[in-house]
């Protein structure tokens, strides 16, 4: 695949993940009313797509590489691929845990905490590997 295609792919996949995370975060923060069915749908969707974007982070697709696409993916990813993969795994595990908690019928108070853990896993990667 061309670098441009890989960048567009991963940006789209990350956008899908953000779309799923948004309402759960809003519910967890009390900005919108908790809706168990919507929350469950979003949690399961997030877990289902959590593995998607990472294959789009390929050689030649980071900031400073020779492509014509705007990207926030820092060159640091290439310098610390192992750290980047660890962040991916943490996110995937946190998202899977959230979906499992929903399936297990956990109380909203526990789900709220787990949404926080998912968000923290997003932030941990963004802080190190995404441009401001």
Curated annotation (Swiss-Prot):
Q: What PROSITE patterns does the entry give? A: CYTCII
UniProt entry tagged with the keyword Amino-acid biosynthesis: no
This protein's UniProt keywords: Electron transport, Heme, Iron, Metal-binding, Transport
| InterPro entries listed in its UniProt record | Cyt_c/b562, Cyt_c_II, Cyt_c_prime
Please verify whether the record's keywords include Electron transport.
yes
Q: How is it modified after translation?
A: Binds 1 heme c group covalently per subunit.
The record's function comment reads: Cytochrome c' is the most widely occurring bacterial c-type cytochrome. Cytochromes c' are high-spin proteins and the heme has no sixth ligand. Their exact function is not known.
Its recorded name reads: Cytochrome c'
What is the organism of origin for this protein? Answer: Halomonas halodenitrificans (strain ATCC 12084 / NCIMB 8669)
């Amino acid at each position: 695949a061309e670098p441009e295609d890989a960048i567009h792919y991963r940006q789209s996949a990350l956008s899908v993940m953000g779309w799923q995370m948004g309402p759960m975060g809003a519910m967890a923060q009390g900005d919108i009313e908790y809706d168990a069915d919507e929350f469950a749908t979003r949690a399961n969707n997030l877990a289902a797509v959590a593995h998607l974007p990472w294959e789009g982070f390929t050689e030649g697709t980071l900031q400073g590489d020779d492509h014509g696409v705007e990207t926030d993916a820092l060159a640091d990813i290439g310098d610390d691929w192992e750290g980047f993969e660890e962040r991916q795994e943490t996110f995937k595990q946190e998202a899977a845990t959230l979906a499992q908690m929903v399936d297990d019928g956990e109380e909203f108070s526990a789900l709220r905490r787990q949404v926080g853990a998912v968000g923290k896993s997003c932030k941990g990667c963004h802080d190190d590997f995404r441009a401001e």
